[in-house]
Design a protein with these regions (language model features):
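Conserved phosphate- and dinucleotide-binding cores of soluble alpha/beta proteins
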Residues: 2, 11-12, 19, 125-251
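Active-site metal-binding loops of divalent metal-dependent hydrolases
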Residues: 99-100, 206
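HTH-adjacent hinge/linker in prokaryotic transcriptional regulators
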Residues: 2-9, 15-23, 28, 34-98, ...
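A generic "binding-loop/recognition-motif" signal
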Residues: 62, 101, 123
Length: 251
């Protein structure tokens, strides 16, 4: 087996089992412990897994503050947002999720006559100067870490909306665990708006792939359009097999 293929399969195996011993990996992949150690170290260095006593475990993505995330990969996020905005048409009713990439869409939507429903404080503030944008807040209490509005009855505020398109953010994406999020209260509204939309767009830069957070709010095959800056070939194959339109944002 090729080294790159084996490392990918080790990662998937750890993701599936949450934590495994090095001896288990040696047995499953039929290679030496030294080989497993080298393969595991590569995955640790990339941040996908972490070492624990006697083995390895999934490196769950922690909930970072909005400001921490906003400064990362800013150029790529703007390209992705600009590409996503091209799919919005006058008259659309859309949902814009709380996220640093989805937030960037507002600049490219400001001249369109649309209705935006959002759980994001920053989307509301950024849209404020643009009269063409009708903005509806989902309400709830302000979760300062994500600068979004949340409540455990949050889904009730959007369960009767009929969205033309929803533009979703994610903490981590993987084929095995789907589209994930670190906030349980945010995840409920994400699940609901996806069910209420004609088309689901997922906006994510390359750093979000092969990671997952605490809550899966939808499976990857439920996404209609995946917009990113670059993606591994395994996701390209998955998109083709599941009729997901994969769009690479370019200048």
């Amino acid at each position: 087996m090729l080294k790159t293929k084996r490392i990918q399969q080790i990662q998937e195996y750890v993701f599936e089992h949450e934590s495994v011993s090095l001896d288990d990996l040696v047995s499953v992949f039929e290679v030496s412990k030294n080989t497993i150690r080298r393969d595991v170290q590569k995955l640790v260095d990339e941040g996908h897994i972490k070492k624990v006593y006697g083995g390895v475990a999934v490196n769950h993505v922690k909930l970072e503050s909005f400001n921490e995330r906003q400064t990362r990969n800013q150029f790529q996020k703007r390209l992705i947002a600009k590409t996503a905005a091209q799919y919005v048409e006058d008259g659309d009713v859309i949902f814009i999720d709380s996220g640093t990439t989805t937030l960037e869409m507002i600049e490219f939507l400001k001249d369109k006559s649309i209705t935006i429903v959002t759980n994001s404080l920053d989307v509301i503030v950024k849209a404020l100067p643009f009269d063409a944008l009708k903005v509806i807040s989902t309400g709830g209490y302000l979760e300062r870490e994500t600068q979004s509005f949340s409540s455990f009855n949050h889904a009730n505020s959007v369960k009767n909306y009929n969205f033309d398109k929803v533009f979703m953010a994610s903490t981590g994406i993987s084929i095995s665990n789907g589209v994930t999020n670190s906030s349980p209260v945010e995840s409920e509204i994400k699940e609901t708006v996806i069910k209420r939309s004609t088309k689901v767009f997922l906006l994510a830069d390359h750093t979000k792939f092969d990671k997952y957070a605490m809550i899966t709010y939808c499976q990857l095959h439920e996404v209609d359009y995946l917009i990113t800056d670059k993606v591994d070939v395994s996701y390209q194959h998955y998109a083709k097999e599941n009729e997901i339109t994969l769009i690479l944002a370019e200048e």
